[in-house]
């Protein structure tokens, strides 16, 4: 009997079967005003309401018979299965730039916890006040007294889309652009290597977190079984896209082309999926501001050749998308409509960041009323979720999910 693949993503819109999320936790309560910028937040969310909103989001998915797995639970189970807490902890501490005796204090303290508690601490951050007072021997320890953390919190973890992305039956485990997020992909790596659900399968890693250039899941869209669309953005480096293409062409029998689309390097457009997502077979939502008045932007078609890669530059974005989908035309639904003020406001609140749970069926934030009405007018079934606190992190329903399995399109 052939074993069913643990990972299977061959489109953006196939019926969503299994998804990985992270419930917002105490890491959000370790954000303070002076560290907002370094932790990539614009405001301090209200955790209790944020959790209610996230629970509503999860129930919405479960109501469509989607299996929802929690990152924190799987990570603890994987750590227990690995039977080597110290090895994982050593890697985490090393990537947190802890040195000298402080690294030993941190390790000894965290080793006293069971797997669930340890994972919780590693995600929420470790305050200096939590460890008993000790004598400081080194200059850097004495001078760094005002900084409150041994291990920084990971408040962006509820955006599970970015640390990794499934392509086909394999995965990219990503090198994150910002230091504040770099440890996040370690939890995905731990789960895929050691959790019983995944460890007995040979899962190809198309791009690993040891890569020299940054790549993030919000920039990775699986258009078809043969075509990947990747944003070159504030967070994803063009060199990472080229290396990913080379890896896919040499190791994946299905992938024939990678499309690289250039988007402005700004915080509001931090990933491709903040300005462009697929909602149906030939329908997409788009933030109009990423194109010029003629609907053009830079897109590059990467294909395998005898000498390595062929790269073809194009400007006619809509036509390229139609061609790779085998459609005569595609419909671009503008986020916020034609009004530039409404469009900018709703894009800022993730109006273009839809999560497709089936062809023509999406989950969106309730606050983006103009965008949601336009989707419905275009024949899309829209499930709205409450979002006053979730949206403060600058990510929407697609950002908050890492799809592990979708039905293949017929």
UniProtKB/Swiss-Prot annotation:
Q: Which PANTHER family match?
A: ARGININE DEIMINASE
Spell out the disulfide connections: none
- Which of the seven top EC classes does this enzyme belong to? hydrolase
Subcellular location(s): the record lists:
Cytoplasm
Q: What is its EC number?
A: 3.5.3.6
Database matches in InterPro entries: Arg_deiminase
What Gene3D superfamilies does the annotation carry?
Arginine deiminase, L-arginine/glycine Amidinotransferase, Chain A
Write out the GO biological process terms. Answer: arginine catabolic process to ornithine; arginine deiminase pathway
> What protein family does this chain belong to?
Belongs to the arginine deiminase family.
User: Keywords on this record?
Assistant: Arginine metabolism, Cytoplasm, Hydrolase
Q: Which gene encodes it?
A: arcA
Q: Which Pfam families match?
A: ADI
Catalytic reaction equation(s): L-arginine + H2O = L-citrulline + NH4(+)
Origin species, per record, is Listeria monocytogenes serotype 4a (strain HCC23)
One Gene Ontology CC term in the entry: cytoplasm
Copy the pathway line from the protein's UniProt record: Amino-acid degradation; L-arginine degradation via ADI pathway; carbamoyl phosphate from L-arginine: step 1/2
Name the catalytic site residues: 399 (amidino-cysteine intermediate)
Q: From the Swiss-Prot or TrEMBL record, give the protein name.
A: Arginine deiminase
One annotated GO molecular function: arginine deiminase activity
């Amino acid at each position: 009997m052939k074993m069913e693949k643990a990972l299977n993503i061959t489109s953006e819109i196939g019926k969503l079967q299994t998804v990985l999320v992270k419930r917002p936790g105490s890491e959000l309560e370790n954000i303070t005003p002076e560290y907002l910028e370094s932790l990539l937040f614009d405001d301090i969310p209200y955790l209790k309401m944020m959790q209610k909103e996230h629970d509503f989001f999860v129930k919405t998915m479960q109501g469509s018979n989607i299996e929802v797995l929690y990152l924190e639970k799987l990570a603890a189970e994987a750590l227990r299965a690995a039977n080597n807490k110290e090895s994982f902890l050593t890697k985490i501490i090393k990537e947190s730039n802890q040195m000298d005796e402080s690294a030993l204090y941190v390790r000894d303290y965290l080793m006293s916890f069971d797997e669930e508690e340890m994972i919780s601490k590693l995600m929420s951050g470790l305050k200096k006040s939590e460890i008993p007072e000790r004598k400081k021997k080194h200059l850097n320890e004495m001078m760094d007294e005002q900084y409150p953390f041994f291990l920084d919190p990971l408040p962006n973890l509820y955006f599970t889309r970015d640390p990794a992305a499934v392509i086909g039956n394999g995965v990219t485990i990503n090198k994150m652009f910002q230091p504040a997020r770099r440890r996040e992909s370690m939890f995905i790596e731990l789960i895929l290597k050691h959790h019983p659900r995944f460890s007995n399968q040979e899962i190809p890693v198309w791009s690993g977190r040891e890569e020299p250039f940054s790549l993030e899941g919000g920039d990775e869209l699986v258009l078809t079984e043969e075509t990947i669309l990747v944003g070159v953005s504030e967070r994803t480096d063009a060199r990472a896209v080229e290396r990913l293409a080379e890896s896919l062409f040499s190791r994946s029998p299905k992938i024939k082309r990678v499309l690289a689309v250039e988007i402005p390097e700004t915080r509001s457009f931090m990933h491709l999926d903040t300005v462009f997502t697929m909602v149906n077979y030939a329908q997409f939502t788009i933030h109009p501001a990423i194109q010029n008045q003629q609907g053009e932007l830079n897109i590059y078609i990467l294909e395998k050749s005898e000498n390595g890669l062929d790269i073809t530059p194009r400007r006619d974005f809509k036509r390229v998308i139609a061609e790779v989908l085998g459609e005569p035309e595609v419909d671009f639904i503008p986020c916020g409509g034609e009004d530039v003020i409404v469009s900018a406001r709703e894009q800022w609140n993730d109006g273009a960041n839809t999560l497709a749970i089936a062809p023509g069926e999406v989950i969106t934030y309730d606050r983006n009323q103009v965008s949601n009405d336009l989707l419905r007018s275009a024949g899309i079934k829209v499930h709205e979720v409450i979002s006053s606190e979730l949206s403060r992190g600058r990510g929407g329903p697609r950002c908050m999910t890492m799809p592990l399995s979708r039905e293949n399109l017929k």
